[in-house]
Structures are given as C-alpha cells and as structure tokens.
C-alpha cells in the first residue's frame, strides 16, 4: 500500500471516530448509576416521537447534531422518555410504566418536548420547555455553563 492510500484510509478512520453516536437510555435509575460511575450529568428528554413536531425537530436538528453529540458523549448520560401515540409505535407495558414514573416526577404537566438537565442524583439543574430558541452551539454552551456552576 502506498503512502497516499494509507493516508486516505487513516483520514477516513479518524473522521468516522470523530463523530460519536449517543447511547440513549430509557431507564432513569440505570442512567443515574452510570452518571455516578462516570461523573456525568443526565439530560432527560420527554418526546412524542410520532406526533410531536417540535420533539422530532429537536432530535433531528439539535440532539443528532455533531456538535451536540460530541459534547454529550463526553459529558452527559442521555435518557429518552418517549410517549408515542400510534398503535404501531406503542412501547412495551414495562417501558410505558417506567416512562410514566419519570413523567410523574419530572414532567407532571405533560409538556412536549421537555428537556431536563439533572445531577447524577436526579436533582434538576434546568428545564427547557419546547424547542430551544437557540443554535446547537448555544444550547451546548448553556449546558456547559450550568455544569460548570454546579460543580
């Protein structure tokens, strides 16, 4: 293999490694254990994945954005409490029960989307109702600032 080919392979590999895909949890208690172990904060997102336009937009434009993903992979444990409405998308009863319990504690008013930044113990640091009115970079910067002030 010549130098040019090797360089191309290495660059492609580095590019692929630089884009991280977030692991989403659907059990808050499990997420708390991981957050404690890894010394991270928890970002809890309430969504209606098949009926809530702003929820879908939030996922596509911010939570799936490379800037957010890079930050979240290093600093956050991500939890999604989804409340789909279409019969074909219904969650198993056990998951619905878990999500209902999370909503009872953190989203009793049923706001969608609702994003909540939590400490590793589940203490609320900040809530965002609806779709953020800022860019992905500004959203990440706000979370960084909240984390810095919490420590």
Name what the model sees in each region.
Residues 104-105, 109-150:
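Non-catalytic, surface beta->alpha helical segment in thiol-disulfide oxidoreductase systems
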